[in-house]
């Protein structure tokens, strides 16, 4: 469970994600598991999340910019504030969170809202973020959901008051489950930094030799130590006991950072399977199914495939079927490795908004199956440390994203952010002797906050958010505030945005006109796909990441007769897959297509395919009696889903083909 520090120099939280995930995920995740007998798990809670969540205990509107504006009467909002509130209220996943509320769906696409409509939008936005526990057990939330529309200012006040009371009990609930032996709680270095990069930027090159790192970088080993010790202190102050385990931010490790953790009393950590495979110079998965001892520290290595099944693949599937599939995958491993330890490690908050009912149905099915299973039991990480371990002689540097650090360093924007951080460090050092202890302490706080991995995550073109400008400003403001504390003028470069102007158009271009390409698998004409829509899979990852599949770009479009698709990417790897599954709703078509040139019938739906320079599909429209359809694809290899397309969920196609909204004049 993690959120970066969204506070500005005045201490006001600039983005509402801590509060929103608190009412949706932070209580729900342990609660859903604790409903089932005999299950155990480990929950990781980061320091910035702890610090900010505590600010919502009393009068949350005084600590959160969004909630302060949200609570206002809409008639009192300045125009820019009004636009920002509406933007946030429309930032929710439509199919799983907006669509279940009829009134929310009505308002979602309205461009102009009167004051009463805005109150409805605001209330329904917060209600859509309420998790299953609140929807089932809280009378205030249930009554407001039942009201459906025509909310009042008093409803807003009541809602915020009730949710403030609710979030104030979250950490005590974790402590209760910990004390009863149901869960173990771990934490992460203070501001979620990539410790190996703080220790030595050369780790980025060791993990991937092609990585460009900043020139004249500084080793920030003292900061790395503070990130660890301060996290431990805050954890103890919050929960009343010592943190014995750490999830290094983003599973990022190297030998020196792990030695640092051990020296601070940490007994176990977890990271990704890619680190193990690189450390052993072997990809034999049997090596994954145990715990390891490295320098007297216990390490569990995350099973990427099993974890991604839950985090990504199952979101579109029937809950019972998904649970049975997962148990089947566990059983395959158990039959070959009866004493195997499996480490399933997940993003605790960002996946569930893509599931129906915030993942409740899926987890209820899975936890029921696990609770009644005789050959598999769940364990806490502190229990794992008591089991026999395999010795690991060396530890390769890397993270849980492709075993490298390229998500946080390498791109020109990421490099620029690091350079500004190092510049500020050098300027601060020149004036350090002139500063009193209180000022030094405040400056150190800003440096530790600026080292958060999240800022670097959003720089570059590998992840997208509509709030990139806000993240960029928060990062630079930490450095500007340092110059203000020193008493000197901040460099002009700090007032220039690092992040380039980006929008969803960078990864998703909608069709501009009809197309009628010949389906032959060949890149034989520049004009073949002119006017098509494009989904760039390489650029659409957001708050979560996974191993990226072979398909990197999708072209799509239609004419009077057919809907066309072209899949580009690593064609050999793509065609080595067993099949591509096509799912079309609401006409309930689902079928497998092979990577060859042929005609296939899915029921009465005729589908042409061709494989060559890329893979192409044409779907006959004549049997589709709908104005709009939703299509997604699943790339299957050896019975496993290795990629879901498009990565943002499903492609909605308007069969009426009104392109006017996509034209630029």
Language-model features: where?
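Acidic (Asp/Glu)-rich catalytic clusters
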Residues: 34-36, 172-187, 262, 293, ...
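Short, well-ordered beta-strand segments enriched in hydrophobic/aromatic residues
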Residues: 188, 521, 562-570, 614-620
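CE4/NodB-like, metal-dependent polysaccharide N-deacetylase domain
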Residues: 209-248, 328-345
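Structured, charged N-terminal subsegments at the starts of enzyme catalytic cores
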Residues: 161-192, 201-202
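Acidic/polar low-complexity flexible segments
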Residues: 509-514, 583-598, 622-665
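Short, solvent-exposed turn/loop segments enriched in Gly/Ser/Thr/Pro and often Arg
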Residues: 44-49, 189-192, 245-253, 382-385
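Catalytic domains of cell-wall/extracellular-matrix polysaccharide-remodeling enzymes
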Residues: 222-283, 350-370
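Active-site and substrate-binding clefts of carbohydrate-active enzymes
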Residues: 1-146, 280-513
């Amino acid at each position: 469970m993690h959120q970066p520090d969204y506070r500005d120099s005045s201490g006001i939280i600039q983005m509402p994600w801590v509060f929103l995930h608190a009412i949706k995920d932070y209580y729900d995740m342990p609660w859903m598991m604790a409903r089932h007998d005999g299950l155990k798990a480990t929950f990781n809670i980061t320091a910035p999340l702890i610090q900010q969540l505590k600010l919502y205990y009393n009068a949350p509107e005084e600590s959160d910019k969004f909630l302060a504006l949200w609570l206002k009467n809409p008639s009192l909002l300045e125009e820019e504030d009004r636009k920002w509130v509406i933007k946030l209220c429309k930032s929710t996943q439509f199919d799983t969170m907006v669509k279940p509320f009829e009134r929310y769906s009505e308002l979602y696409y309205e461009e102009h809202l009167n004051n009463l409509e805005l109150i409805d939008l605001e209330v329904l936005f917060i209600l859509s973020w309420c998790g299953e526990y609140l929807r089932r057990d809280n009378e205030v939330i249930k009554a407001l959901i039942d009201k459906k529309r025509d909310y009042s200012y008093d409803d807003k006040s009541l809602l915020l008051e009730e949710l403030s009371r609710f979030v104030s009990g979250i950490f005590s609930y974790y402590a209760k489950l910990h004390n009863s032996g149901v869960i173990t709680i771990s934490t992460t270095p203070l501001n979620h930094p990539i410790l190996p990069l703080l220790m030595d930027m050369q780790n980025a090159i060791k993990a991937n030799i092609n990585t460009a790192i900043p020139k004249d970088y500084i080793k920030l080993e003292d900061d790395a130590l503070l990130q660890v010790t301060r996290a431990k202190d805050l954890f103890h102050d919050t929960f009343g006991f010592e943190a014995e385990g750490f999830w290094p931010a983003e599973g990022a490790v190297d030998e020196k950072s792990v030695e640092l953790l051990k020296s601070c009393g940490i007994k176990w950590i977890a990271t990704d399977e890619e680190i193990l495979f690189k450390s052993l110079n072997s990809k034999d998965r049997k090596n994954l199914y145990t715990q390891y001892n490295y320098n007297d520290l216990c390490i569990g290595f995350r099973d990427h495939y099993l974890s991604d099944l839950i985090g990504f693949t199952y979101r579109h599937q029937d809950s019972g079927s998904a649970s049975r599939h997962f148990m089947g995958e566990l059983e395959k491993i158990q039959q070959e490795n009866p004493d195997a330890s499996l480490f399933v490690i997940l993003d605790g908050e960002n996946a569930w908004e893509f599931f129906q009912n915030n993942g409740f149905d899926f987890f209820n099915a899975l936890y029921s199956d696990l609770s009644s299973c005789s050959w598999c039991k769940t364990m806490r990480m502190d229990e794992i440390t008591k089991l026999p371990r395999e010795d690991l002689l060396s530890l390769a540097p890397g993270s849980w994203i492709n075993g490298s650090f390229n998500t946080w360093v390498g791109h020109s924007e990421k490099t620029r952010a690091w350079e500004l951080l190092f510049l500020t460090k050098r300027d601060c050092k020149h004036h350090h002797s002139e500063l009193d202890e209180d000022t030094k302490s405040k400056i150190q706080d800003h440096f530790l906050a600026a080292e958060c991995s999240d800022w670097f995550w959003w720089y570059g073109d590998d992840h997208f958010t509509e709030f990139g400008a806000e993240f960029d400003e928060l990062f630079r403001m930490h450095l500007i505030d340092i110059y203000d504390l020193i008493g000197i003028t901040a460099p002009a470069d700090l007032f220039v945005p690092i992040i380039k102007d980006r929008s969803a158009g960078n990864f998703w271009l909608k069709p501009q006109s009809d197309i009628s390409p010949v389906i032959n698998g060949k890149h034989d004409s520049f004009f073949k796909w002119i006017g098509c829509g494009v989904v760039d899979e390489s650029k659409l990852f957001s708050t979560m990441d996974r191993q990226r599949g072979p398909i990197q770009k999708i072209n799509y479009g239609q004419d009077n007769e057919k809907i066309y698709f072209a899949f580009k990417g690593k064609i050999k790897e793509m065609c080595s897959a067993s099949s591509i599954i096509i799912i079309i709703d609401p006409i309930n078509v689902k079928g497998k297509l092979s990577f060859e040139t042929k005609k296939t019938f899915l029921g009465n739906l005729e589908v042409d395919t061709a494989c060559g320079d890329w893979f192409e599909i044409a779907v006959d429209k004549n049997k589709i009696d709908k104005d709009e359809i939703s299509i997604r694809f699943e790339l299957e290899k050896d019975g496993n889903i290795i990629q879901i397309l498009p990565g943002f969920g499903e492609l909605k196609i308007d069969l009426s083909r009104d392109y006017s909204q996509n034209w630029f004049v």
